[in-house]
Curated annotation (Swiss-Prot):
This is GTP 3',8-cyclase. The gene is moaA. S-adenosyl-L-methionine binds at Y31, G71, S122, M193. InterPro entries: Aldolase_TIM, Elp3/MiaA/NifB-like_rSAM, MoaA, MoaA_NifB_PqqE_Fe-S-bd_CS, MoaA_twitch, MoCo_biosynth_MoaA/MoaC, rSAM. [4Fe-4S] cluster 2 binds at C257, C260, C274. Its cofactor is [4Fe-4S] cluster. Binds 2 [4Fe-4S] clusters. Binds 1 [4Fe-4S] cluster coordinated with 3 cysteines and an exchangeable S-adenosyl-L-methionine and 1 [4Fe-4S] cluster coordinated with 3 cysteines and the GTP-derived substrate. GTP binds at R18, R67, T98, K159, R262, V263, R264. The lineage of its organism: Bacteria, Pseudomonadati, Pseudomonadota, Gammaproteobacteria, Pseudomonadales. Belongs to the radical SAM superfamily. MoaA family. It comes from Ectopseudomonas mendocina (strain ymp).
């Protein structure tokens, strides 16, 4: 018999899975991957059936929230078939997707119909040239059209994600908040994760803390702490007089590890117990050596959780903490 929940050595119960369905993306965001990124051969990527087997095992062990990530998850062929199966799982309290928004104009309504409840959409700039510099793609209008389509599709909540960098887009914080407020969206501001080596900028020089961002917002808006809990690392503040909540993801300035309730599985089937550590369990090898053996998979997950570290040790200097890019991990 297997236990019906996953608990790490520090007593934290794991209820949230971030499941990457592809390492591929139609953008090349400077903080996420290199321009000449080499993607994994397709045979190394988990099949949709294998992805469902992983999700099913986690659900059987008490996971109640699943977020589908990438790369860009919406470029994965036949993704809707996986989402429909997950959307039918009554045990799940939440099925969400993180996307760059490029495919949402066509995909928003089918995603909602498949059972996706919440969307996170990356948006680092409202200025066309700056957006193109961040993403290395001139597709801001396409993303904005996708946001409009998502609003029309009737998701429970839509949240924007903005990575803030000093001297690159920190002057747009208020504009991004206004954009969210006008559309009834939430927004999270993110301190850049030190994953992979970047050449486009110096992370030390572009670091912008969540406290700095919040102070800028409070120059125009009153913020009050929110009790909102989504299962992720954001800490939320309500913009007084609006529907908008502002979140802050602060891996550097406000370590969020103490109540970590999540793990990641990469598109290649690696179980990542912590963003800040390279240790990973190869689930793909197990899945392909013992197809259909759900009990063996659950046992492997339970044993792996004994190795989950207490916290990461991210730094803001140029030392690369983890060698994999965010796109390889699952955003």
């Amino acid at each position: 018999m297997h236990t019906n929940q996953l608990v790490d050595p520090f007593g934290r119960r794991i209820t949230y899975l971030r499941l990457s369905v592809t390492d591929r993306c139609d953008f090349r965001c400077t903080y996420c991957m290199s321009e000449d990124m080499q993607f994994a051969p397709r045979q190394q990527i988990l099949s949709l059936e294998e992805l469902y087997a992983v999700a099913d095992a986690f659900i059987g062990l008490g996971v109640r929230r699943i977020r589908i990530t990438g790369g860009e998850p919406l470029v994965r062929k036949n993704l809707l078939s996986l989402l429909q199966r997950l959307g039918e799982r009554d045990e799940l309290d939440d099925l969400a997707i993180t996307t760059n928004g490029s495919q949402l104009a066509e995909m928003a309504a089918p995603l909602r119909a498949a059972g996706v409840r919440r969307l996170n959409i990356s948006l680092d700039s409202l200025q066309r040239e700056r957006f193109a510099a961040f993403t290395r793609r001139d597709k801001l209008d396409q993303v904005l059209a996708g946001i409009d389509a998502a609003r029309a599709a009737g998701f429970d909540r839509i949240k924007l994600n903005s990575v803030v960098q000093s001297g690159r887009n920190d002057d747009e914080v208020l504009d991004l908040v206004e954009f969210a407020v006008e559309r009834g969206l939430d927004i999270s501001f993110i301190e850049e994760m030190p994953l992979g080596s970047v050449v486009s900028h110096s992370r030390e020089q572009t670091f912008c803390s969540s406290d700095e961002v919040r102070q800028r917002i409070e120059q125009r808006h009153a913020l009050v702490r929110s009790s909102k809990v989504t299962g992720g690392p954001s800490r939320y503040w309500q913009v007084v007089g609006t529907q908008t909540q502002v979140g802050f993801i602060s891996p550097h300035s406000h370590n969020f590890c103490g109540d970590c309730n999540r793990v990641r599985v990469t598109a290649e089937g690696k179980l990542v117990l912590c963003l800040g550590h390279d240790n990973a369990l190869d689930l793909k090898r197990l899945l392909r050596a013992h197809p259909g053996d759900s009990e063996r998979l659950r046992q492997a997950l339970t044993e792996a959780l004994r190795l989950k570290p207490e916290r990461h040790h991210f730094a803001t200097d140029e030392q690369v903490q983890v060698v994999r890019f965010m796109s390889m991990t699952g955003g």
